[in-house]
């Protein structure tokens, strides 16, 4: 429950963060399909004997090359099979957290028997769409998720419709937190971060706890491309400086290594993405530790980072050709800049420089290489902060950057929402040809 004395707008900010910053086990696109399969299996009479699934092109893109936690296998078919046979239908993005060794073995056997199929839904106007249909003999259950990774819109079985999400909004119902957030500004977000009672935002410290554990696991060197562990090793060899900049990159990329490599630890996600959550969290944590920040300062910096990342990403399609680690890192830049000097001017300059730097990075599907993009984005964020501290930034005379940071963000998001749609189609076409 909220403190009734809190500013109503601040309450919506907090709700937005609570809705968009959640624990997630495994890359969220395969996990969305696993959840659909798990919920369908829960509705089915008898054990699952066969799984059919259909996904949007964007979800297929983000599911082709990523490891499903605990399985050592990549791709959507194993996610669908394990969700159906070992998923917890009530666990949301942590649907696979209780999957047993037996369930994993059964899922692999179902896959080997050719009883699992995943296809692109055609036609499909939705960017995020997953549908799983599970069978037991002639009996079946089908679940459809649309728009958000856990947004179930339809449940149906051989006996009829079980649930359909109502599209209409009841009269007098409050606007969603994200709708409210779309009308705010970075300046208003900063005012909130500076003035909100610590007790109201203490919960955001959980993002540091979860993502730091994932980072520590990544530093073991056995996950994904082990970028974090490799860079740490190069520090020991004297090929890379042991400094704050290196620590930011190493600890952030290590968390992504573990995440994309299939570690069975949850990430605290942001905007439906574990890597975005990692990118919005770890650079801020490292800088906070460097300055000896207490829990309250860390919580305020993390709240600024996560809320800014949500604010920017809310102006984008849920999935697109733009690598959203870059927009999450803009949030991290805000959080790090706040820790150093707290000025709005520094924060806005850092974000503007980020937009002038890494805006062209494409999303070519979830995979181990996401950790490369996470490390690049984290490095760019700290560089932008250092520039801003010296009163230097990419100016409104250059490229898509405008004189006003809000317009710069709008320009970036317009590119991703419109012009990069053809880029997305080309990426999906290339990836589909490789999968044949």
From Swiss-Prot:
One record GO biological process: L-cysteine catabolic process to pyruvate
Triggers of expression: Transcription induced by L-cysteine (in vivo), under control of DecR. Member of the dlsT(yhaO)-yhaM operon.
Top-level taxon in the UniProt lineage: Bacteria
One example GO MF annotation: L-cysteine desulfhydrase activity
Phenotype of gene-disrupted mutants: Slightly increased sensitivity to excess L-cysteine, the effect is more pronounced in M9 minimal medium. Cells produce about 9% of wild-type levels of hydrogen sulfide in the presence of excess cysteine.
Family named by the database record: Belongs to the UPF0597 family.
Annotated function: Plays a role in L-cysteine detoxification; it has been speculated to be a cysteine desulfhydrase.
Protein name: UPF0597 protein YhaM
């Amino acid at each position: 429950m909220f403190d009734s004395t809190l500013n109503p707008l601040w309450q919506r900010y907090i709700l937005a963060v609570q809705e968009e910053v959640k624990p997630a086990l495994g890359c969220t696109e395969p996990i969305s399909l696993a959840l659909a399969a798990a919920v369908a299996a829960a509705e089915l009479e008898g054990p699952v004997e066969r799984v059919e699934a259909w996904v949007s092109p964007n979800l297929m893109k983000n599911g082709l090359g990523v490891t499903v936690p605990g399985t050592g296998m990549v791709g959507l078919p194993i996610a669908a099979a394990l969700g159906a046979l070992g998923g917890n239908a009530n666990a949301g993005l942590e649907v696979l957290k209780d999957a047993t060794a037996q369930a994993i073995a059964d899922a692999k056997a179902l896959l080997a028997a050719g009883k699992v199929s995943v296809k692109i839904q055609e036609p499909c106007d939705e960017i995020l769409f997953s549908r799983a249909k599970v069978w037991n003999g002639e009996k079946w259950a089908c679940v459809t998720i649309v728009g958000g990774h856990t947004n179930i819109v339809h449940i149906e079985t051989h006996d009829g419709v079980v649930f359909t999400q109502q599209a209409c909004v009841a009269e007098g119902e409050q606007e969603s937190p994200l709708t409210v957030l779309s009308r705010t500004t970075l300046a208003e977000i900063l005012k909130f971060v500076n003035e909100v009672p610590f007790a109201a935002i203490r919960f955001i410290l959980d993002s540091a706890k979860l993502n730091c554990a994932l980072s520590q696991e990544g530093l073991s060197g056995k996950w994904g491309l082990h970028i974090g562990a490799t860079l740490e090793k190069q520090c020991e060899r004297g090929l890379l400086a042991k400094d704050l900049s290196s620590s930011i990159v190493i600890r952030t990329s290590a968390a992504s290594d573990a995440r994309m490599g299939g570690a069975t630890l949850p990430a605290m996600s942001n905007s439906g993405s574990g890597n975005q959550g990692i990118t919005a969290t770890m650079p801020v944590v490292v800088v906070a530790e460097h300055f000896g920040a207490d829990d309250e300062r860390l919580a305020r910096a993390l709240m600024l980072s996560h809320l800014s990342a949500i604010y920017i990403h809310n102006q984008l399609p849920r999935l697109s050709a733009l690598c959203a680690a870059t927009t999450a890192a803009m949030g991290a830049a805000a959080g790090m800049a706040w820790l150093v000097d707290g000025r709005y001017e520094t924060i806005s300059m850092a974000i503007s420089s980020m937009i002038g730097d890494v805006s062209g990075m494409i999303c070519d599907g979830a995979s181990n290489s996401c950790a490369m993009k996470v490390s690049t984005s984290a490095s760019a964020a700290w560089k932008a902060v250092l520039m801003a501290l010296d009163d230097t930034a990419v100016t409104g005379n250059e490229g898509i950057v405008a004189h006003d940071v809000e317009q710069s963000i709008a320009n970036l998001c317009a590119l991703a929402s419109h012009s990069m749609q053809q880029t997305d189609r080309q990426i999906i076409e290339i990836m589909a040809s490789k999968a044949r």
